[in-house]
């Protein structure tokens, strides 16, 4: 690695740390003014952003699962602006009293929410994340260091240029947001920046997340990878099931809350053809186990139906592909989920309250659903505003990582001259 590159990044990280200390002095109204100004400038600057995005898209195959994630258009930019306005409208997550008490000696204790400080994000070809992360980080009083994928470098730099312009116009340091150089080595420097970055959140493939977890010295929160199951129970309502499965698989197949494996009770194999019929209209390729394959053979398009191999279970497809697993009991379904789940989002379709209760109790995932689509795993859908990612771990945060999850806390203690006895 070039020492010049490493030294340049380290010096810049020191400047980001300095900028982070000024953010705690900002009022929520000032932060909201910045966010609303940014949201209002997206449309006037859309041409430059979309031109940069097109240059990124030209280097990527349309068949790539990443293509849809990389794509920006006017409609998506409008949605991003709306999300930023929504973040501005949310209550501040800072200086919230989490706990309060007065001790017998008269000391008054208050536990309150405070910013993390400097948050690092390593992500792949998702330029919308650049906007989302900045909005959430600023609202929660944090500075941000970004390492985007090289596939989206032009898009990210156009977006960051706009954000820096807005920050400068509000007399805030552009060092509040730092986009690392595109070189791969920059991520290595970032992951080793103990004392300069407080937390790193990787967003992307399981391979990316594993690499960051295994390499980073800075604390890491795992997000993103979703191996998502929906179990159609023997009491499941067919028409409801058709709509849920179709929505979970085809709404946006390239995102982490999309359905990967349909589990069906063996007593409902007779309904499998009807359950999957809408999927054929969307050209969904099904990898079915033997019993499911035989049930689908006469009705599902031959070119879209294949025998499942072991690797098809436990795969995050990120495309119009689906594996189907047949089980004989609820326990079998739960065991399959436990074996292959990434602990992101799991769902059951059932009319049996006992099955629903057991599923909620025993499935170990950040979000567990009954009789609805896993597509709802999203900070905005939860009423939290845009999220930085979906945490699939249990320490600090789990599920959508929105404003509160980007804060920590400190104890503030007031006294009247008390001293601790020897």
Curated annotation (Swiss-Prot):
Keyword tRNA-binding (UniProt)? no
Q: Which Gene3D superfamilies match?
A: Aldehyde Dehydrogenase, Chain A, domain 1 (3.40.605.10), Aldehyde Dehydrogenase, Chain A, domain 2 (3.40.309.10)
Give the location in the cell: Cytoplasm
Identify the CDD domains for this entry. ALDH_F18-19_ProA-GPR (cd07079)
One CC-aspect GO term: cytoplasm
What does the record give as the reaction this protein catalyses? L-glutamate 5-semialdehyde + phosphate + NADP(+) = L-glutamyl 5-phosphate + NADPH + H(+)
Q: Report the EC code(s) recorded for this entry.
A: 1.2.1.41
Please provide the Gene Ontology terms (biological process) for this protein: L-proline biosynthetic process
One GO MF term on file is:
NADP binding
The biological pathway it contributes to is: Amino-acid biosynthesis; L-proline biosynthesis; L-glutamate 5-semialdehyde from L-glutamate: step 2/2
Q: Which InterPro entries match?
A: Ald_DH/histidinol_DH, Ald_DH_C, Ald_DH_N, G-glutamylP_reductase_CS, Glu-5-SA_DH, GPR_dom
Please provide the record's keywords in A-Z order. Answer: Amino-acid biosynthesis, Cytoplasm, NADP, Oxidoreductase, Proline biosynthesis
Cell division: present as a keyword of the record? no
- Protein origin, superkingdom: Bacteria
Q: Which NCBIfam families match?
A: PRK00197.1, proA
Q: Which family does it belong to?
A: Belongs to the gamma-glutamyl phosphate reductase family.
Quote the function comment for this protein: Catalyzes the NADPH-dependent reduction of L-glutamate 5-phosphate into L-glutamate 5-semialdehyde and phosphate. The product spontaneously undergoes cyclization to form 1-pyrroline-5-carboxylate.
Q: HAMAP family in the record, alphabetically?
A: ProA (MF_00412)
The protein's name: Gamma-glutamyl phosphate reductase
Q: Give the organism the record lists.
A: Chlorobium phaeovibrioides (strain DSM 265 / 1930) (Prosthecochloris vibrioformis (strain DSM 265))
- Source taxonomy: Bacteria, Pseudomonadati, Chlorobiota, Chlorobiia, Chlorobiales
Please name the gene that encodes this protein.
Answer: proA
């Amino acid at each position: 690695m070039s020492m010049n590159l490493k030294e340049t990044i380290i010096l810049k990280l020191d400047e980001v740390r300095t900028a982070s200390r000024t953010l705690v002095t900002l009022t929520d109204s000032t932060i909201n003014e910045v966010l609303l100004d940014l949201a209002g400038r997206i449309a006037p600057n859309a041409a430059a952003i979309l031109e940069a995005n097109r240059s990124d898209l030209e280097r990527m195959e349309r068949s790539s699962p990443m293509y849809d994630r990389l794509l920006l258009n006017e409609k998506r930019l409008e949605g991003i602006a709306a999300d930023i306005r929504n973040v501005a409208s949310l209550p501040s997550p800072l200086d919230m009293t989490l706990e309060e008490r007065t001790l017998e000696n008269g000391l008054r204790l208050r536990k309150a929410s405070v910013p993390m400080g400097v948050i690092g994000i390593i992500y792949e070809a998702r330029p919308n994340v650049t906007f989302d992360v900045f909005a959430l980080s600023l609202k929660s009083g944090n500075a941000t260091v970004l390492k985007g994928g090289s596939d989206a470098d032009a898009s990210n730099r156009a977006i960051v240029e706009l954000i820096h312009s807005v920050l400068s116009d509000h007399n805030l340091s552009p060092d509040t947001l730092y986009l690392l150089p595109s070189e791969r080595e920059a991520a290595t420097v970032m992951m080793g920046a103990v004392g300069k970055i407080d937390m790193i959140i990787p967003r992307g493939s399981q391979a990316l997340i594993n690499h960051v977890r295994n390499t980073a010295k800075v604390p890491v929160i795992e997000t993103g990878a979703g191996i998502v199951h929906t179990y159609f129970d023997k009491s499941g309502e067919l028409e409801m099931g058709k709509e849920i499965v179709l929505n979970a698989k085809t709404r946006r197949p390239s995102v982490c809350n999309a359905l990967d494996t349909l589990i069906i009770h063996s007593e409902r194999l007779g309904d499998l053809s009807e359950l999957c019929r809408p999927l054929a209209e969307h050209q969904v390729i099904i990898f079915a186990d033997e019993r499911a394959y035989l049930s689908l053979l006469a009705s599902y398009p031959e070119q879209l139906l294949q025998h499942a191999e072991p690797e098809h279970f436990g795969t995050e497809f990120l495309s119009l592909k689906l594996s189907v697993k047949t089980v004989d009991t609820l326990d079998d379904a739960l065991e399959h989920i436990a074996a292959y789940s990434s602990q992101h989002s799991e769902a059951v379709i059932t009319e049996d309250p006992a099955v629903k209760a057991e599923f909620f109790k025993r499935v170990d995932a950040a979000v567990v659903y009954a009789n609805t689509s896993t597509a709802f795993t999203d900070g905005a859908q939860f009423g939290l505003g845009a999220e930085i990612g979906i945490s699939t771990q249990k320490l600090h945060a789990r599920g959508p990582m929105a404003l509160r999850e980007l804060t920590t806390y400190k104890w503030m203690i007031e006294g009247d001259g008390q001293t601790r006895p020897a």
